[in-house]
Amino acid sequence: MPKHCFLGLLIMLLTTATETQPAHVSLKPQKVQFQSRNFHNILHWQPGNSLTSNGSVYFVQYKTYGQGQWKDKNDCWGTTALFCDLTKETLDPYEPYYGRVMMAWAGSYSEWTRTPRFTPWWETKLDPPVVTITRVNASLRVRLRPPELPHRNQTGKNTSMENYYNLVYRVSIINNSLEKEQKAYEGTQRAVEIQGLTPHCSYCVVAEMYQPMFDRRSPRSKERCVQIP
C-alpha cells in the first residue's frame, strides 16, 4: 500500500474512533471542582467533550469524606446550570467533602465525574474587609468588618471569620494631593484611629486581611475617601 494511502487510512480510523466514542465517556462533565469564597461553597463544572450543552441536564451528589453513600442534591437534580450551591451541605469548615456530577443528553448518560477532596477551611478565599471611616477634626476613625459567613451561632447571628482564622488587618492611607500611599496600621484590632492629617487635603483609606498561617491575603477593599477641612 502506498505510504500516502496508509496515512489517509490511519487518519480515517482515528477520526471514526473519536466520533464513535461511547456516550458515557464523551458526555462526562469536565473540570468538576469546588470554588469557595467566605465558606460559600459552589460546585462548578464544564460540559463533556462532545460539547452537547444544548438540551443537556446534570445531576449532582455529595458526601463527606469517609462516608460510603452519596446523597442527592435535590435542587441540582436535573439542572441545566453549570454550577450548584453546596454551602448548606458543606457547613463544617474542617470536614473534607466530595462532590460529583453526571450529565444526561438525548437519552444517554455519562459516567460520574468527582471532585478532588475539598476542605473549606483550607481552600476558601476571603473577600476584603468592609471599611467605614468617620472624620473627627484632623483624624480619621476607621472601622473594619470581616466578610459575613453562612454559619450562624445559637442566637441566629452570623459567626465571624475570626472564629476560624487568626486575621491581621492592614490599613493604608492615600494622600490624594501628593499621590502618596503609606501604611497606617497593621494588627488584629478592628478599630483604628489615624491622626496628624494635613488640613485641606483629601485622603482615601484602603484595607486588606492577611492570614499568617497560610501566608495568604485578601484583595484590597474599596477606597473610602474624605476631605480634611
Curated annotation (Swiss-Prot):
GO terms for cellular component: cytosol; extracellular region; plasma membrane. Keywords: Disulfide bond, Glycoprotein, Receptor, Repeat, Secreted, Signal. Its main location: secreted. InterPro entries: FN3_dom, FN3_sf, Ig-like_fold, Interferon/interleukin_rcp_dom, Type-II_Cytokine-TF_Rcpt. The record marks Y65, R117 as: Critical for IL22-binding. SUPFAM superfamilies: Fibronectin type III (SSF49265). Residues 1-19 form the signal peptide. Residues 28-127, 128-229 form the Fibronectin type-III domain. One of its GO terms (molecular function) is cytokine receptor activity. It is found in: Secreted. Gene3D superfamilies: Immunoglobulins (2.60.40.10). Pfam families: Interfer-bind (PF09294), Tissue_fac (PF01108). Disulfide bonds join C76-C84, C204-C225. GO terms for biological process: cytokine-mediated signaling pathway; negative regulation of inflammatory response. Glycans are attached at N54. It comes from the Eukaryota. Belongs to the type II cytokine receptor family. PANTHER family: INTERFERON/INTERLEUKIN RECEPTOR (PTHR20859), INTERLEUKIN-22 RECEPTOR SUBUNIT ALPHA-2 (PTHR20859:SF51). Receptor for IL22. Binds to IL22, prevents interaction with the functional IL-22R complex and blocks the activity of IL22 (in vitro). May play an important role as an IL22 antagonist in the regulation of inflammatory responses. This is Interleukin-22 receptor subunit alpha-2. It comes from Rattus norvegicus (Rat).
